[in-house]
Amino acid sequence: MRRPKSSHVRMEPVAPRSHNTMPMLDQFRSNHPETSKIEGVSSLDTALKVFWNNQREQLGNFAGQTHLPLSRVRKILKSDPEVKKISCDVPALFSKACEYFILEVTLRAWMHTQSCTRETIRRCDIFQAVKNSGTYDFLIDRVPFGPHCVTHQGVQPPAEMILPDMNVPIDMDQIEEENMMEERSVGFDLNCDLQ
């Protein structure tokens, strides 16, 4: 039997295709188009209410499928030396709670991104989402924030300017004399003949 050339072998993906966004966020966006152009804090509250109502509806249809790997969640839970045994329901429950956390922080960061008229979530958007939330403010020390986050809106950080003291009296005659001395000290004359 002859084997096909390696260039003709079609490789099947090991894992299912990954998405740019989580499917629940896509459903939220498609079910509630009025939240796509939201501005201000009150609209963030509206978006969060719609989001959590949608999550409650989906929770009724929850069949145990999670987007985070349960084996990894179980390993993280077992990494604590005080944990001896883990019930079989705990990884699924913890995974679902992590999904809700990720979705809400992402929604808050997305709202901040849209308020800055951008279409890409950046680290500073996540920082602002955590900072502006009373629930997640304990994470402020864990989310990195640097000076690069200030320039994303086109606003440069203030530069240090050293200005002369404006209250000192200036003698204009002395400045004119210094300028005249500099002009005389030039070492050549343009009108002289070079031979």
Swiss-Prot record:
Family: Belongs to the NFYC/HAP5 subunit family.
Pfam families: CBFD_NFYB_HMF
Keyword tags: Activator, DNA-binding, Nucleus, Transcription, Transcription regulation
GO (cellular component) term, any one: nucleus
CDD domains in the cross-refs: HFD_NFYC-like
GO function terms (MF aspect): DNA binding; DNA-binding transcription factor activity; protein heterodimerization activity
Matching InterPro entries: CBFA_NFYB_domain (IPR003958), Histone-fold (IPR009072), Transcr_DNA_Rep_Reg (IPR050568)
Stretches for region Disordered: 1-24
Protein name: Nuclear transcription factor Y subunit C-10
Organism of provenance: Arabidopsis thaliana (Mouse-ear cress)
